[in-house]
């Protein structure tokens, strides 16, 4: 019981590490909340601090989710799904105690959670992400599409017997919850995509013809 409580606390604290915010403050003397979208996640870090900072931010945020799902293994915790620890880490990332409970959009950390629990399902989703990213040139659109596919797939694949061969109720519910968090956190992006003014990355074909505002 003590190990379980300790593990859940560690998962939240791990998720609460505001990677982009701290990198900006320590190495660039910039507060990401005052630049670009004001978000402290991977996309805004890339845009404001550059490729190296963005890559490091993504890697750490991603690993937060994966490591959280492995905490039961490290702490010898039985009887509780690793997905619970992953979910707690994502909640920590979204509402971090180290950053006034104002966190990122949960994409990288959620991806890390999925990898830690179901590498095959992760591989399927990452293919969708890359294809959508190339077509739209928008990380936000790719994240939104993947979240939608995750919800549909976790419900349908066990029925079809592919990738997810059987229903796992807890896994299904947590995937739906993580995807819902991502969709809710991207509401502003959805509005910009609708208005064709979303920020782009310099890769892909921008099929929706977005024109970001200067």
Swiss-Prot record:
Pathway: Lipid metabolism; phospholipid metabolism. Keywords: Cell membrane, Lipid biosynthesis, Lipid metabolism, Membrane, Phospholipid biosynthesis, Phospholipid metabolism, Transferase, Transmembrane, Transmembrane helix. Its main location: membrane. It is found in: Cell membrane. It is a multi-pass membrane protein. GO terms for cellular component: plasma membrane. GO terms for molecular function: acyl-phosphate glycerol-3-phosphate acyltransferase activity. SMART domains: G3P_acyltransf. One of its GO terms (biological process) is phospholipid biosynthetic process. Its EC number is 2.3.1.275. Coiled coil: none annotated. It catalyses: an acyl phosphate + sn-glycerol 3-phosphate = a 1-acyl-sn-glycero-3-phosphate + phosphate. InterPro entries: G3P_acylTferase_PlsY. The chain crosses the membrane at residues 8-28, 70-90, 111-131, 144-164, 165-185. HAMAP family: PlsY (MF_01043). Probably interacts with PlsX. Catalyzes the transfer of an acyl group from acyl-phosphate (acyl-PO(4)) to glycerol-3-phosphate (G3P) to form lysophosphatidic acid (LPA). This enzyme utilizes acyl-phosphate as fatty acyl donor, but not acyl-CoA or acyl-ACP. PANTHER family: GLYCEROL-3-PHOSPHATE ACYLTRANSFERASE-RELATED (PTHR30309:SF0), INNER MEMBRANE PROTEIN YGIH (PTHR30309). Belongs to the PlsY family. This is Glycerol-3-phosphate acyltransferase. It comes from Streptococcus gordonii (strain Challis / ATCC 35105 / BCRC 15272 / CH1 / DL1 / V288).
